[in-house]
Swiss-Prot record:
This is Metaxin-3. It comes from Homo sapiens. Part of a large protein complex spanning both mitochondrial membranes termed the mitochondrial intermembrane space bridging (MIB) complex. Belongs to the metaxin family. It comes from the Eukaryota. The gene is MTX3. InterPro entries: Glutathione-S-Trfase_C_sf, Glutathione_S-Trfase, Metaxin1/3, Metaxin_GST, Mito_Protein_Transport_Metaxin, Sam37/metaxin_N. The lineage of its organism: Eukaryota, Metazoa, Chordata, Craniata, Vertebrata. It is found in: Mitochondrion; Mitochondrion outer membrane.
Length: 312
């Protein structure tokens, strides 16, 4: 019997099986294709790598990045696109490229760069999933990585300043959402009544943006005006993830939000404490290193010591 396929990914909240877009893409595709994945949610007991999440562990190998994981699943006969025509397959590749170029930078900015969102939602949530003291370090690194990823792809002339880049990525993201809404129309999925790879990608990118409660919501507000995209996300959640979610009542979600607020305060206090300790250590006077005294041997002792070194 073949070893089960195990997917390591970030966990969920706000009614989502995962708050991480790339993890959601793989989870949705596995549901659509019937791939029997065992999901291992990363929490504060996790000791593995988090840099390339999601990670698919097979009997012989480890696969990371959504595109590579989906290709592996297709080779294992778990193909959500088997009913698509050649043109629909080409459209899928074009739309995925559009999502990664036009929508992903705005999603990264909303979660990791927008200051209010990062400090009140993103940082405390991810810190709660990571063991101490990495919980104080890794979210910051992930934030810098997201910013570098945005600037690498969008910080080209004539957009030199971050504010110019921010304005452009949100314009592009809204245009992308409008295009997706027009393409979906009144259909259940993008290519009819059966979900495919494109549906997994769109769901993975849109669902966190739609469900997570942010203080700064300019792109979220635009998305919520596109009712067919919101219905698309809700239908996938209710049809494919209902049992795994267990349902969160409004009262329960308020409890989650209250706990997150407490966690935010705790993480910020710990971060401030470590910064103060670091500043104190840097400012404290540093004593010169002590030199060990050199013992001088008498001629007789030197002769005896030399003889002992030569002895077996």
């Amino acid at each position: 019997m073949a070893a089960p396929l195990e997917l390591s990914c970030w966990g969920g909240g706000w009614g989502l099986p995962s708050v991480h877009s790339e993890s959601l893409v793989v989870m949705a595709y596995a549901k659509f294709s019937g791939a029997p994945l065992k999901v291992n949610v990363i929490d504060n007991t996790w000791r593995g790598s988090r840099g390339d999440v999601p990670i698919l562990t097979t009997e012989d190998d480890m696969v990371s990045q959504p595109a590579k994981i989906l290709n592996f699943l297709r080779k294992q006969k778990y193909n959500a696109d088997y009913e698509l025509s050649a043109k629909q397959g080409a459209d899928t590749l074009a739309y995925i490229a559009l999502l990664e170029e036009k929508l992903l930078p705005a999603v990264l900015h909303t979660f990791w760069v927008e200051s209010d969102n990062y400090f009140t939602v993103t940082k405390p949530w991810f810190a709660s999933q990571i063991p101490f003291p990495l919980s104080l370090i890794l979210p910051g690194r992930m934030s810098k990585g997201a910013l570098n990823r945005i600037l690498l792809t969008r910080g080209q002339p004539p957009l030199y300043h971050l504010r110019e880049v921010e304005a452009q990525i949100y314009r592009d993201a809204k245009e992308c959402l409008n295009l997706l809404s027009n393409r979906l129309g009144t259909s259940q999925f993008f290519f009819g009544d059966t979900p495919s790879t494109l549906d997994a990608y769109v769901f993975g990118f849109l669902a966190p943006l739609y469900k997570v409660r942010f203080p700064k919501v300019q792109l979220q507000e635009h998305l919520k005006q596109l009712s067919n995209l919101c219905r698309f996300c809700d239908d996938i959640l209710s049809s494919y993830f209902r049992l795994s979610l267990g349902g969160i009542s409004p009262a329960g979600q308020e409890t989650v939000d209250a706990n997150l607020q407490k966690l935010t305060q705790l993480v910020n206090k710990e971060s401030n404490l470590i910064e103060k300790m670091d500043d104190n250590l840097r400012q404290s006077p540093q004593l010169p290193p002590r030199k060990l005294p050199t013992l001088k041997l008498t001629p007789a002792e030197e002769e005896n010591n030399s003889f002992q070194r030569l002895s077996p």
